[in-house]
Amino acid sequence: MAQDIKNEEVEEVQEEEVVETAEETTPEKSELDLANERADEFENKYLRAHAEMQNIQRRANEERQNLQRYRSQDLAKAILPSLDNLERALAVEGLTDDVKKGLAMVQESLIHALKEEGIEEIAADGEFDHNYHMAIQTLPGDDEHPVDTIAQVFQKGYKLHDRILRPAMVVVYN
């Protein structure tokens, strides 16, 4: 019996040690788990911040390229009325040949400078395209003049690369 009591006491002490050991192990695991979770959280934040920085750099690069590509847009819009006036002046009757030749040279040099900057005249013949043309008047269409074709150009249109500076103002058969 004394042996049984000693065995029971030893078993109780061993059970208490096992419970204490298990309790000691659990906090260590939870601290390790917490540290791993925090490390994962910091890594996730780092990856997000890195991706955001790359996006900011990419957007800044694209914006810089667009500014460079369309830098002459405002100047071209300011020059286009002068180019229109030169064209009207060349159409006036009674000018001497020397004056017409001088006006034509100025017009050609302006057109050349605009082309070097990527500015092109919008084609205003054939079919009407609402992306490039502005209908300011319509005429009835017939067999000779199909519907949605351009009858006359009142003012030339221009574009800078893929951006419309000014649509061509046209008369359209309807």
Swiss-Prot record:
SUPFAM superfamilies: Coiled-coil domain of nucleotide exchange factor GrpE, Head domain of nucleotide exchange factor GrpE. One of its GO terms (cellular component) is cytoplasm. Keywords: Chaperone, Cytoplasm, Stress response. GO terms for molecular function: adenyl-nucleotide exchange factor activity; protein homodimerization activity; protein-folding chaperone binding; unfolded protein binding. Its main location: cytoplasm. Residues 1-35 are annotated as: Disordered. InterPro entries: GrpE, GrpE_coiled_coil, GrpE_head. It holds the Pfam family GrpE. GO terms for biological process: protein folding. Residues 26-35 have a biased composition (Basic and acidic residues). Residues 9-25 have a biased composition (Acidic residues). Belongs to the GrpE family. NCBIfam families: PRK14140.1, PRK14156.1. Participates actively in the response to hyperosmotic and heat shock by preventing the aggregation of stress-denatured proteins, in association with DnaK and GrpE. It is the nucleotide exchange factor for DnaK and may function as a thermosensor. Unfolded proteins bind initially to DnaJ; upon interaction with the DnaJ-bound protein, DnaK hydrolyzes its bound ATP, resulting in the formation of a stable complex. GrpE releases ADP from DnaK; ATP binding to DnaK triggers the release of the substrate protein, thus completing the reaction cycle. Homodimer. This is Protein GrpE. The gene is grpE.
